């Protein structure tokens, strides 16, 4: 059977492809490439939010000027283009959970939630309703045939690798999705945009958290979850109250800058005691993480979960999109996934994603991932954290005395 460039049967003109057009360079080039090859291309842009200043902010996406840019590109290509209002859905599926997660002391990754719900569930369903054979996006990731299905692989351009944000894609979605930029470097994509005459050829790349004006995520969280800005105290792991804070929303595990205390010692946020509004700080070595426990795991590997090896599977994992994969061993016992690092990781916060790969090479296959619920650190660190957390009554008394001496700003 003849397969076209998207691994679909038949000639390109016999395949209808919906392209998710954000108004940026990447998705515009995808639409241009597919149109040039002869596919029946339909562009769809999702209006996800309209938050005043964010609408025209450099680096924003899916609002205001971006919609106009997508429309202009579609006109240049001569393809149909539709704008769908998904603001309410985006708020419910992405923004509200993002704020709730931060209020619980987690470090969420909203782009993953957006891909899970709005883009690869709702938009994909719309593409099927339009009788499209595939949904194509401008993500930098590769997909190709793997047995009876398709699998995800890290892209050619490792600097643009977006596999971390796509681990939650289900097998059914992977089979329907196409990623034409997976084998192209970003520099070449920009050249193509210029060659195609797109007005977006020199447009800035969108930021990770697209709905946050000027990167001030605390403003949105303060509005949606005011309890996250309750004042509290900053406590050293030795139990000493060092200072005050104006809300745990301003802190994340591993943070060093902007903690708000000066002791002459290099201090990092090592734990957030959300219930008691306490920020626990300590030396960097207390951030060394040996084991993770995960929730909401999407497993894309070949091994059946009911036949998972008792001693686990060695693989590479990423706990941040900007970090390289590190070797670890994945375990699955009694419905619980856990990860043992072969070399300790640093600054792993609840809510972060942990993504699995079959190796640490540039073209490694994505095996899924999950979200961190909690971690285990060195035995001494665990003991010190338990001690300061159990010493709540004493710490609270000291904190009350401290508050009488210092006024909150």
Curated annotation (Swiss-Prot):
Disulfide bonds, which pairs?
Answer: 114-210
Q: Name one Pfam family in it.
A: tRNA_Me_trans_M
> What's the EC number here?
2.8.1.13
Subcellular location as annotated: Cytoplasm
Q: Where is this region: Interaction with tRNA?
A: 160-162
- Name any one GO molecular function: ATP binding
GO terms under cellular component: cytoplasm
Enzyme class, broadest EC rank: transferase
Q: Where is the active site?
A: 114, 210
What SUPFAM superfamilies does this protein's entry cite?
Adenine nucleotide alpha hydrolases-like
- Binding-site residues for ATP, renumbered to this chain: 20-27, 46, 138
Q: Origin, by domain of life?
A: Bacteria
What catalytic activity does the UniProt entry give for this protein?
Answer: S-sulfanyl-L-cysteinyl-[protein] + uridine(34) in tRNA + AH2 + ATP = 2-thiouridine(34) in tRNA + L-cysteinyl-[protein] + A + AMP + diphosphate + H(+)
Keyword entries, A-Z:
ATP-binding, Cytoplasm, Disulfide bond, Nucleotide-binding, RNA-binding, Transferase, tRNA processing, tRNA-binding
For this chain, the family text in UniProt reads: Belongs to the MnmA/TRMU family.
What protein is this chain from? tRNA-specific 2-thiouridylase MnmA
